[in-house]
Design a protein with these regions (language model features):
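Flexible loop and strand-edge segments within Gram-negative outer membrane beta-barrel domains
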Residues: 67-108, 112-119, 125-196, 204-214, ...
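Short, well-ordered amphipathic alpha-helices
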Residues: 128, 217-224
């Protein structure tokens, strides 16, 4: 993960702004002395709650129904959000050979959990093949593969779920502040006013999936004849094959998404 500065807080021009996407505010160590939000100063919040030594007022905590006073510190929002990706596979294979033929059957599964919460992949594959000698001159066989997979993912590009993670000011605790206001899961509660969904809210409410099914394989018949010796022979082979697949895409934006405020379901 990239290294971020750990000194300056949310805001711009040296002024703290709890709804700013920038990190050009005052030093984090000075937030308790902020004239508007600082717990050490006289302002509307300390008039209501009393002085809060060494702390500052966070409107998003108040909106979530939590204690609105926080101790200034730098957070690693990227490390808190991303998970360790894990992938594992299981395979079973059965094969046997006879005097005049052979067969093989295999079954496999691959499961992956992505680094973004709620993302991953499940894939199953089946393979069958067989070959038989029908006559000293005639051989036939086939092989077929069937693969089915489901991929759970999140939005990308202009609506990327990680946009609010990478750009989050280090003074804002994304993991510790609920992503929606108290009692209303459809109203987002985040550090910026934007058309990009909060990453934690998106993981809980938006769903993007891709389901695919694919079959590919071939069958053949082969005629072999010799001209007196093993080094002089003729093979004639006829083979047909197929490769077909379908993919269904689903995009669901939850009610309250900044991209689709009333929700959206498309396939």
């Amino acid at each position: 993960l990239p290294e971020l500065q750990q000194e300056y807080s949310q805001g711009s021009g040296g002024t703290f702004d709890p709804s700013s996407p920038f990190a050009w505010g005052p030093k984090i160590s000075e937030l308790a002395n902020d004239p508007t939000y600082g717990g050490n100063t006289d302002n509307s919040y300390t008039s209501q709650y009393g002085k809060q030594s060494g702390k500052y007022y966070v409107p998003q905590l108040a909106a979530a129904g939590m204690n609105p006073w926080a101790t200034p510190q730098a957070y690693n929002n990227m490390k808190d959000f991303f998970e360790t990706g894990v992938s594992w596979s299981n395979n079973v294979n059965v094969a046997q050979r006879f005097d005049k033929g052979n067969y093989s059957f295999s079954l496999g599964n691959t499961t992956s959990n992505g680094i973004v919460p709620s993302t991953g992949m499940d894939r199953y594959n089946v393979k069958m093949s067989a070959e038989a000698q029908l006559h000293p001159n005639w051989t036939t066989g086939f092989n077929g593969n069937f693969v089915t997979s489901k991929i759970s993912k999140q939005s990308t590009a202009n609506t990327s779920v990680v946009a609010t993670i990478y750009n989050a000011p280090v003074s804002y605790n994304m993991a510790g502040i609920p992503s929606h206001i108290e009692g209303d899961p459809y109203t987002q509660n985040t550090y910026r006013d934007s058309w990009i969904d909060d990453a934690y809210w998106a993981v809980d409410n938006n769903q993007f999936s891709e389901r695919s099914q694919r079959f590919f394989g071939n069958a053949f018949v082969k005629y072999t004849t010799k001209f007196g010796t093993d080094n002089h022979k003729l093979d004639i082979k006829y083979q047909i094959g197929d490769d077909a697949y379908t993919t269904n895409y689903s995009e669901i934006y939850g009610y309250g998404s900044t991209w689709a405020p009333t929700g959206e379901d498309s396939e």
